[in-house]
C-alpha cells in the first residue's frame, strides 16, 4: 500500500521537500544553515506574535509597554529576549549561509541566489524597523539617522523623508507605520523563503566539490533531518546561553533610556549586524556617495555570478581564490568593528581603507585570482 505522504496532495508537497527529497551524499554542516534560518524565522514569528499582544505602537506608551512586558507579563522577559537575541542568531545564520554560497559557488543558481538577496534586504528592513519599536534613545536616533539618508536623493529627497516619517520628524506616525511593516514583513519573508526553496529544488543542492550530484544522491530523511536537528540543538544552546546569561550583551545600554528628541546620544550606531554597512556609509565624506556605497555593499552580491571567471564552481581546490575569500571575511569583521567606533582618527582611515578593500576584493581580486588559477591549470 502506498504511504499517505505519497498520495495526499498536501503531504506530497511536504514529502517532496523534506522527506523523499534526493540530496547530494556529501553535503557538509555548511548546508545546515538553510534549515536553521527557517527555525529562526518560525521562532521570530511566534515570539513576535506574543510580544505584539502586549505592545502598544504609540510614542507615549511604547517604551513603558516594553517595560510592562519584561516585568509584568508571565515569561514576558524570556519572550522579549528570545526575540531580540533571536534576531542576532538569524543574522549570524544568514551571513554564514551567504558565505557558504560564495565559497562553494552556489550563486550560479541564479534564481535561488537573487531571491536570497531579496530575502536579505527584506530581513534587514524588518530588523531595522523592529529596533525602532522599543522607543529608546538608540531606537529613536537610529531611526532619525537612517531615514534621513533618503534626503540624499536629488530633488525629491526632503519630501521623501517627510513622507516616510509622516510628519516633520520621527514621531508617533513613524512608530505606527514601522510597527505595521515590522508585523507584515516576516510573512512576506516566509513566502519568499518558499519561493527560494522552490527554485532550489528545481536544480537540486550544490555540494562542496562543485560537481554534479546526479550520480550519487540519498534521501533527505533520515540522513539530513538528523543532521539538521543537531544543528538546531547547537543553535538553541547558543541562543539560550545568550538569553539566560547575558541577554543585553549585543544591545545598546542607551536603549534603556526613553526616546528624547532634545537629547542626542554621543555615538549613534545600529545593531551589530548592520555595522559593516554603517562603516561603509560613514567612510564616504559625501552624503549621496555614502548612501550609494551603502546600497552597493549589499547589491554587489547580485553582480557576483557575472564576476565568476573560474572554470570550477567551488573554491575547494582553488587556493588563490580561497585567499581572496578569507581576505573578504576578515575585511568584513574589521568593518563591523569600525562601525561601532566613534568617528575619529585612526578609525576614519581604517574604515576608508577597509571599505575600498571590500569593493576591490569582490570586483578585482576575486575575478583576477580565478583567471590566474585558470592559467595555472591551463584552462584558458
Curated annotation (Swiss-Prot):
Binding locations of a ubiquinone: 201
Transmembrane segments annotated in the record for this chain: 33-53, 77-98, 113-133, 178-198, 226-246, 288-308, 320-340, 347-367
GO CC field: mitochondrial inner membrane; respiratory chain complex III
Cofactor: heme b
Cofactor note: Binds 2 heme b groups non-covalently.
UniProt keyword Mitochondrion, yes or no: yes
InterPro entries: Cyt_b/b6_C, Cyt_b/b6_C_sf, Cyt_b/b6_N, Cytb/b6-like_sf, Cytochrome_b, Cytochrome_b_C_euk/bac, Cytochrome_b_N_euk/bac, Di-haem_cyt_TM
Record CDD domains: cytochrome_b_C, Cytochrome_b_N
Pfam families, per the entry: Cytochrom_B_C, Cytochrome_B
Family to which the UniProt record says this protein belongs: Belongs to the cytochrome b family.
Self-association and partners: The cytochrome bc1 complex contains 11 subunits: 3 respiratory subunits (MT-CYB, CYC1 and UQCRFS1), 2 core proteins (UQCRC1 and UQCRC2) and 6 low-molecular weight proteins (UQCRH/QCR6, UQCRB/QCR7, UQCRQ/QCR8, UQCR10/QCR9, UQCR11/QCR10 and a cleavage product of UQCRFS1). This cytochrome bc1 complex then forms a dimer.
Function in brief: Component of the ubiquinol-cytochrome c reductase complex (complex III or cytochrome b-c1 complex) that is part of the mitochondrial respiratory chain. The b-c1 complex mediates electron transfer from ubiquinol to cytochrome c. Contributes to the generation of a proton gradient across the mitochondrial membrane that is then used for ATP synthesis.
PANTHER family according to UniProt: CYTOCHROME B
Protein name: Cytochrome b
Organism classification: Eukaryota, Metazoa, Chordata, Craniata, Vertebrata
